[in-house]
Amino acid sequence: VVAGSVGRRSTSFSERPKEALRRGALMKMLQQNALTLPLFISKEDEKPPPLCGAVPAEPNYVAKVGDMVAALARGPDDDENWILAEVLHYNHSSCKYDVDDIDEEQKERHTLSRRRVVPLPLLRANPTTDPGALFPKGALVMALYPQTTCFYRALVHEPPSGPQEDYLVLFEDSSYPEGYSPPLAVAQRYVICCKETRKK
């Protein structure tokens, strides 16, 4: 094995027609990833563990290499966005993560402090047995906008009604008169607590 080649992805963008295909494949992979997230089945008097549905991680939790996270990263235009990223490394002495933008077109690597990284749920909550492990109707959250790799602020319109169901969320969107999008479906995997980002 050539040193440094492990886990590297192809960065050849000469095949332009393949970009749409790659993007379609990425969206399919993200959807698949959400569907295969294990469902937590609680026993009597058992509480859902951290990172089950809306249950936050422990304060000292460190995401593992390969985990998907939401990361507040600065883009090429100097704007900051919460992006879907993969953890490459965590430096315990500096308390910083190295993460890779999951979007191949951006393919940016970022070094970020812990407060700029939010781990995604590792388990789905079962609405039947653990409704308290879900964000309630009206909760302010961050959710992955459908067909993108960015998280945006949204209000929960309806929590999942069954283990296989998605949230229905209303994204903040000034192009609509009410300031919110129509209800859009987002999987539990990609709905997290809202981190306040300072307005410019």
What are these regions (language model features)?
Residues 1-200:
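Eukaryotic chromatin- and chromosome-associated nuclear factors
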